[in-house]
Swiss-Prot record:
NCBIfam families, A to Z: PRK05416.1
GO molecular function: ATP binding; GTP binding
Chain's role: Displays ATPase and GTPase activities.
Family annotation (Pfam families): PapZ_C, RapZ-like_N
Annotated protein name in UniProt: Nucleotide-binding protein Mkms_2443
SUPFAM superfamilies in UniProt: P-loop containing nucleoside triphosphate hydrolases
Keyword entries, A-Z: ATP-binding, GTP-binding, Nucleotide-binding
PANTHER family according to UniProt: RNASE ADAPTER PROTEIN RAPZ (PTHR30448:SF0)
UniProt record similarity statement: Belongs to the RapZ-like family.
Record: residues binding ATP: G28, L29, S30, G31, A32, G33, R34, G35
């Protein structure tokens, strides 16, 4: 058995249910990566509910089965902090079975020494630690969840997995044929209003002549054809767009390898009305043709002047 086989133990082939909604119960040891797994499922298009009371899970499924519902994939994160956790999980499975739904159970675990290290790094106490030591809290939880682990459909040991490797494992198990898309926001802004707080990359286009000083263009924005043609017709504008587009493609590929699915590219000029708007629109148009990439344009400061 390879290391990959040891870290991912898939008990039998579990097909998607014919009921119209796919349900995954995400559970496992505290600190083993439940939150990361849930985030990956969310990025794959699953509707994720964290610590939903057991009696509400069936209600959520009913909503998913209702005509016109957009919920076709539901992931529920459950942890040991719920009273009667093991019994709750069994009850949920039986209840869903009466609706012809067989939920899959994803169980995350890690070795004791890795869990101890993670808790010490984050300076957090274990939910079952109480007055005991951290190691005793982990041992108590491991014993409590042993029956759940034994009946899980997929067990992933995250002891030797990076966050990115865990993401890949969950994507392989639950992504089907769907490839998670990267979402890019191209945001124009004005420097006089400050930098965008959510920007991953910032580019200054104040090297281009400012249409503000052209009387006929001043009242219009970078979305107006005359302003757009003026900005893009300046020496170096098209060369800049071509070069920056190639650079961003390299960055996007790197983000994908690192598991980053969202990015914001900010384009700035003085007031966020002319140059940055025209360049942002043109750049977004070039990015639109990228594989597995969704692009939206945001003009933060348009209309503020």
């Amino acid at each position: 058995m390879t290391e990959s086989d040891m870290s991912e133990q898939l008990r039998g082939d579990v097909d998607h249910p014919e009921s119209g909604i796919d349900v995954v119960l995400v559970t496992g040891l505290s600190g083993a990566g439940r939150g990361t797994a849930a985030k990956v499922l969310e990025d794959l298009g699953w509707y994720v509910a964290d610590n939903l009371p057991p009696e509400l899970i069936a209600r959520m499924v009913e909503l998913g089965l209702a005509a016109g519902s957009r919920i076709t994939q539901l992931a529920v994160v459950m942890d040991v902090r719920s009273r009667g956790f093991t019994g709750d999980l069994d009850w949920v499975r039986r209840d869903l079975a009466t609706r012809n739904i067989t939920p899959r159970v994803l169980f995350l675990e890690a070795s004791d020494d890795i869990l101890v290290r993670r808790y010490e790094q984050n300076r957090r106490s274990h939910p079952l630690q109480g007055d005991q030591t951290l190691a005793e809290g982990i041992a108590r939880e491991r014993a409590l969840l042993a029956p759940v682990r034994a009946s899980a459909d997929l067990v992933i040991d995250t002891s030797k997995l990076s966050v990115h490797a865990l993401r890949e494992s969950v994507e392989r198990a639950f992504g089907g044929e769907v490839v998670a898309e990267t979402s890019a926001t191209v945001e124009s802004f004005g420097y006089k209003y400050g930098l965008p707080m959510d920007a991953d990359i910032v580019m200054d286009v104040r090297f281009l002549p400012n249409p503000h000083w052209v009387d006929a263009l001043r009242p219009h924005t970078g979305q107006h054809p005359d302003v757009r043609d003026y900005v893009l017709g300046q020496p170096g504008a098209e060369e800049f767009l071509d070069t920056y587009h190639r650079l961003l493609n390299v960055v996007i590929d790197g983000y994908r390898r690192e598991g980053k699915r969202y990015m914001t590219v900010a384009i700035g000029c003085t007031g966020g009305k002319h140059r940055s708007v025209a360049i942002a629109e043109a750049l977004a148009g070039r990015l639109q043709g990228g594989d597995e990439l969704t692009v939206r344009v945001l003009h933060r400061d348009l209309g503020r002047e």
